[in-house]
């Protein structure tokens, strides 16, 4: 409820008394779209722009049929706003079936939905790669082929700004971020190294893992990372399993 008021208050302040003509809904997951109905209570004349799957979800989530105030777009469809021309690109399963991204050819902005997002707070200085990797692997990781299709479309666009639904707006070194997404979604290891992930009931498997890790390090393995899956951060273990070139699983019988 608090976020609802904060979001609507922010819109009111930015609009300065104007009424929005359109609300573009790219992704229906509730952390993004939960306030569509509340938005329409404040701005009932706004046209909702979305694809067919999204409109079905809006009906199912909120009981809204939006008759007379919806604009259904197709893959590759455009919307001319006067100074801005928007192109809609469907990105199913990145990471829900209705997802689409929007490209503004005037400002050369890609509104990338959950793509290029990351965990963390904007007021905390931290490396983008680590939290973006953990976010990608945990949420989008199994949809690599779908991400690859989206990247092929993005390669044909002049993108100068990426605006994801999670994390910071990206304005510099975009090739680095796009390159990492290509690596992650093609399941190509980033770094030579070994992740050892284990569970141990009585400590014997743990002892074997520690012995293995010591031997690998003594043989010059560039990076050995060990995770106790009963105690360590599972999302970090999963992220590193994709990051490094080799994975060893040790478990009780």
Name every feature range the model reports, one short phrase each.
Residues 50-172:
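Metallo-beta-lactamase
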Residues 29-31, 55, 229-235:
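Short acidic loop-to-helix transition motifs that present clustered carboxylates
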Residues 1-23, 46:
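Pre-active-site segment of Zn-dependent metallo-hydrolases
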Residues 43-47, 159:
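A short helix->loop->beta-strand "cap" motif at the edges of active sites that frequently abuts
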Residues 21, 160, 245-246:
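Conserved acidic residues
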Residues 7, 19-41:
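Di-metal (Zn2+ and/or Mg2+/Mn2+) metal-binding site signature of metallo-dependent hydrolases
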Residues 173-253:
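N-terminal beta1-alpha1-beta2 submodule of the flavodoxin-like/Rossmannoid cofactor-binding fold
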């Amino acid at each position: 409820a608090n976020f609802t008021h904060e979001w609507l208050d922010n819109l009111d302040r930015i609009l300065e008394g104007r009424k929005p003509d359109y609300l573009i809904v790219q992704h229906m997951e509730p952390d993004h779209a939960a306030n569509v109905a509340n938005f329409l209570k404040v701005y009932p004349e706004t046209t909702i722009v979305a694809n067919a799957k999204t409109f079905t979800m809006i009906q199912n989530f909120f009981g809204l049929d939006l008759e007379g105030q919806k604009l259904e777009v197709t893959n590759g469809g455009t919307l001319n706003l006067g100074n801005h021309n928007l192109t809609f690109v469907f990105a199913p399963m990145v990471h829900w079936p209705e997802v689409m991204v929007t490209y503004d050819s005037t400002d050369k902005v890609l509104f990338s939905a959950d793509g290029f997002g990351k965990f963390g707070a904007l007021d905390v200085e931290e490396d983008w790669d680590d939290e973006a990797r953990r976010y990608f692997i945990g949420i989008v990781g199994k949809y690599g082929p779908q991400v690859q299709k989206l990247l092929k479309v993005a390669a044909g666009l002049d993108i100068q700004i990426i605006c994801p639904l999670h994390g910071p707006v990206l304005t510099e070194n975009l090739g680095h971020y796009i390159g990492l997404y290509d690596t992650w979604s093609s399941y190509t290891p980033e770094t030579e190294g070994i992740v050892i992930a284990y569970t141990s009931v009585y400590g014997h498997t743990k002892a074997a893992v520690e012995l293995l890790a010591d031997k690998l390090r003594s043989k010059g393995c560039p990076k050995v990372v060990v995770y106790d899956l009963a105690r360590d951060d599972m999302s970090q273990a999963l992220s590193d399993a994709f990051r490094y070139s080799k994975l060893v699983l040790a478990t009780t019988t």
